[in-house]
Amino acid sequence: MTPGLTVFIPVYNEEAILEQNAEKVLEYLARLGVAHELILGSNGSTDRTPEIGAELARKHGNVQFFHVPERGPGRAFARALRMARYDKFVTLDADLSFDMAFVADALAALEQNDAVIGSKGLGTQKRPLFRIIASDSFIWLTNLLLHMPYRDYAIGAKGYRTAAILPHADKVDAHTFYTQEMIYQVRRAGGRIAEIPVKCEDRRASRFNLLHEGFYRYGKLFGLWFRSLRD
């Protein structure tokens, strides 16, 4: 693939922040001195997000935008992965809760690794205590069942060599479990995975129903565990 960097942000009803945050990302990427693009993937948005995203794509030649009617960041992730022009693929959250320095750090780490995990556990995080406890419990069980040593499986602040995960695009969970799947598949294939510290600050309440998300992710985790027993 062409050397360079694709940054992907899944978006859902982000009319209040989409334009300004996309411009911030583009300004940051321009300072890195590498070929780059930004892909914005609206999934299920019912506000003006699709119109704003389409206008950003018209304004900037290095922005791609798409909208799918069904909500599901994993569904958007898979589509963005197929659209990516460059050999390195980094994911961010729409609210930019992670320090964007992760992008440059991931870009460097992907020279020697197939995946890069931005880890709040290794860095710093300003989040409600109940969210930290819930996340840590899920991470602990993930590592126990899948025999993995990592400390963060959130959607944002992750990086991949595009070629390492593109073969799995058709199997990506449509919703919020795809990070675990991608990391598991890279590790299973013998790929190299780096974990680096990130700074994270919650800028708003979660956009997901946390109780529903808990049941969903635990169900998906046990499903992946059962499949891993057959691998």
Predicted features along the sequence, with ranges:
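A conserved acidic beta->alpha catalytic loop
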Residues: S42-P50, L96
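Short aromatic/hydrophobic "clamp" motif used to bind/position activated sugar donors
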Residues: F89
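Donor nucleotide-sugar binding loop of glycosyltransferases
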Residues: E14-I17, S45, P73, D99
